Amino acid sequence: ISNEDSQDIEFDETNLFSRNRFTGLDRVEGGQRLYYGMRFGVFGTSGYSDGFIGQSYRLRSDNNFSTTSGLNDNFSDIVGRVSIQPSTPVKLQYRFRLDKNDFSPRRNELSANVGPQALKLNLNYSFFDEGSGSGEFSDREEITYGFASQITPAWSIDASTRRDLQASSTLNHNIGLTYECDCFTMKLTFTRTFTQDRDVRPSDTIFIRLIFKNLGEIQSGN
């Protein structure tokens, strides 16, 4: 069976305990495995900090996983996260994947959210080395920054910019307007993308998403 939809694997703490870490339907993870991890935390009256670290072990290595996935050997890479919220308007989070042999970072993700609902600032930093996924891409280092504002109880706006730090270039701009009531949520998003590759050219996209809270959702993009 050809592998069309199970090539892109992102191993992290959210799927450490999953029975099948493959995406899609073309591959199924088999074999006997052991999962183990530790969760820790400190909780106070005004804030908290908590975290998780874990790893998996399989009795036999699995060559269905690529050598860059962190899952092909008996021991997997080490994955985890640390969250810190010293007060209500401030939240920091660090997510990681470390090489099982020398503990070098295969993936680093840092996020910070600061401010009340009236004006919340956000900053996200991501680093993926060339061996953190399918192995088809070189090292990636990106930063995304923006804000979100709850204008009224029903209306909110948000905007963000995503940049490639390796190439010192902007990848996209986003701006969104959201309306939410008891019956439905409507979100209008405008995205300007600057990616250029062969037949891919910079483009503008308007995306409308309508979610009925008891029925489902409708979405359209142009």
Name what the model sees in each region.
Residues 1-222:
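Outer-membrane beta-barrel translocator/pore domains, especially the C-terminal barrels
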